[in-house]
């Protein structure tokens, strides 16, 4: 299982998206993970860098020079996260802030969490992780990682950088400010540097790098929530036809009860 977090049996996680994103996911049977720098609020990456640097400082010691390498990399190489791609999910199926921020006139696709966690194993496989909110979250897990690495030295400069990337990239991509805690976010993380795997699409920030994450058969899609819209019944009719004609069986379709008006 490519997840390090506890998943309750039967848990469903929701990906909020607009109509083009919804069609892309169901027609192509894949998820689209965006470069972490091109998420809706890029300041969250800078926040994560600051928090990570603070945590690394807590563990610096004279007999652990590789921790100094971690600190230098987390502070001095902002381009470090260029290889990290994220697909976001929410525990809540009908959250007003998610409709307003990510999917006005769109949909929330419910995925079986265990299906997402099982998308791959080994280096480079997608990892399903729960987002940490605030400076204090994740400290126990990070301490365990540091202790594990410290016990395995000494390392060459190249090995230290590789290990630092292995530790810091996923950790930095799962940290957000406490003000976002309402989202109860989970992320599917992919570390990908091969040029041929990186695609591009237009977005609010211009040209957005992304990678595709293939979904298995049978599909982990369990539910579709029709977002706030002027005519939800018409939206529902289109969704039900798409699901039926593309072989998505047993998918629950329901309508948002959000007070958002478009």
Features from the language model and the residues they span:
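Partner-binding and oligomerization surfaces adjacent to conserved cores of proteins
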Residues: 1-262
């Amino acid at each position: 299982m490519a997840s390090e977090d506890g998943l309750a049996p039967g848990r469903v996680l929701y990906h909020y998206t607009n109509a083009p994103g919804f069609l892309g996911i169901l027609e192509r049977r894949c998820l689209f993970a965006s470069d972490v720098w091109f998420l809706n609020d890029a300041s969250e990456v800078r926040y994560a860098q600051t928090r990570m640097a603070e945590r690394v400082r807590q563990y610096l010691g004279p007999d652990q020079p590789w921790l100094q390498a971690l600190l230098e990399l987390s502070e001095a190489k902002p381009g470090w996260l260029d290889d990290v791609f994220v697909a976001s999910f929410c525990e809540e199926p009908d959250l007003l802030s998610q409709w307003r921020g990510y999917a006005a006139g769109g949909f929330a696709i419910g995925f079986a969490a265990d299906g997402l966690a099982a998308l791959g194993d080994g280096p480079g496989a997608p990892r399903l992780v729960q987002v940490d909110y605030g400076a204090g979250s994740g400290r126990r897990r990070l301490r365990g990682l540091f202790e594990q690495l410290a016990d395995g030295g000494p390392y060459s400069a190249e090995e230290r950088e590789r290990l630092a990337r292995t530790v810091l990239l996923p950790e930095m991509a799962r940290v957000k400010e406490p003000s976002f805690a309402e989202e109860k976010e989970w992320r599917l993380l992919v570390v990908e540097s091969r040029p041929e795997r990186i695609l591009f699409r237009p977005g609010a920030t211009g040209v957005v790098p992304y990678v595709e994450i293939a979904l298995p058969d049978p599909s982990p899609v369990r539910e579709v929530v029709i977002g706030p819209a002027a005519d939800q019944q018409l939206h529902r009719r289109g969704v039900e036809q798409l699901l039926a004609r593309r072989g998505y069986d047993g998918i629950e379709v329901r309508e948002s009860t959000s007070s958002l008006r478009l």
